Each structure stands twice: as C-alpha cells, then as structure tokens.
Amino acid sequence: MSTAAAQTVGPSADYKISAEYTSTSPDGATKVEQYAKISPDGDYTWQFWARHGDQLTLLKPEQPDYAAGFRFTSDSQWLVRMQKTAAGEGTLYLYHFGPQGFVAATPKPLGELAWAYFNGRPDSRKIKKPDFHIDAGLLKGTDDNYRWMGEKWPDSRYLVITLSGDVLPNGRHSQLRSLRGWRCRYDLQHGRFDVPPDFAESNAKATAPRPE
C-alpha cells in the first residue's frame, strides 16, 4: 500500500473521536482530530490525526492517558502539539505541512531539544537540576507572531518555548521549583534555538534562587 493510501485509512474502529478536542488551522484547511481507545480496565490511549481535504495523517506518537493541545502558526504551515505526559509534566512536538500532510519536523520531541539547549547554557548552572515535574510549554502568541510581547518578528518564523522543573525533596530541602518559565526561541526556518536579549529579565526571574 502506498504512503498516500495509508494516510487515508485513519484510526481503527476501536478509536472514537472526542469532538470537543478538535482544532482547526487559521486558513480552515486542516482539522486536528483526537481519538481515544479505552481498554477494559478504563485506560485511555490517544491518537491524533490531521485531516486536510481527503488526506488523513497520523501525528505520531500516540499517547497514553492524556489528550493534547494544538496550536498552528498563523500561516497554517506549522503545528505544535502540547502534550501532557504525567501529572505536572509535559513536552512539545512540532509538525510541518508538506506533500504527505503534517509530518514530524524534528527527529526528537521539540520539548526534549529545548531542554538539551537549556542544559548547554550558563543559566543551567545557576539552578539545581530539575528531576521532577519536567515541563516544556509553548508561550501563547503563534497567532499574532508574539506582538503582544512587543516583538516585531517575521510572520510564522519563531516559537517561544518555556521550561519549568522541580527538584525532589531530600533530607536538606523540601520540593523546590528550581526553574520557573525560562524562555527560549525556536527558529522554524533554520531549525535552531536562541535567547533574544529581551528575554534576559524574564529568564533572570526564572532562575533566581528560592529559599530551601
């Protein structure tokens, strides 16, 4: 079976759509539909499908337990999946529209890449390394290119990602929120991260020490 044909098959019959989670691209051409399969024990497995005309594309990977949030860039060509993975934890996946529909745009989850970028920067040495409630989020603003932040960036060029994490309690301290919304920017055109100078004040607060 060809790739194109396989993409039109869609979810198997044991997956049922949860219509309340359906989201639509700004140009109206793509809908993201979320389907859940419930096991006899009541466990959920979620699949996410992008519907563009008569083409259905599975947005891998599937996810146990949790539905997801989705945001498109204003040009409708990029799609970010905001995925809860556990209580207080989450990551991001990035997809790009092409001949096969929306497909993964990065070899690893975008959230994982953002953490790797943070861990290579001096800010990471200012804090206790998070080992609990590890979360990567997408700051709102993809619809207006972050103009609400005062930015004047090109249309659909950048994403702003926030990172937060806790440190588990031990004999010396209680649970700590060691990183609180540290920001970086992802360049969709070139596939790389940076930290613009105007993020400095926010990131200083995100890494400021808290009493143990």
Predicted features along the sequence, with ranges:
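Beta-rich catalytic cores
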Residues: 66-68, 147
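Acidic, small-residue rich beta-repeat scaffolds with periodic aromatic anchors
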Residues: 1-18, 91, 99-212
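Residue-level detector of Asp-centered blade-edge/turn motifs that repeat once per structural unit
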Residues: 74-75
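Beta-strand-rich domains and repeat architectures in extracellular enzymes and scaffolds
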Residues: 12-46
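Recurrent small/Gly-Pro-centered beta-turn motifs in extracellular repeat architectures
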Residues: 35, 82-83, 162-163
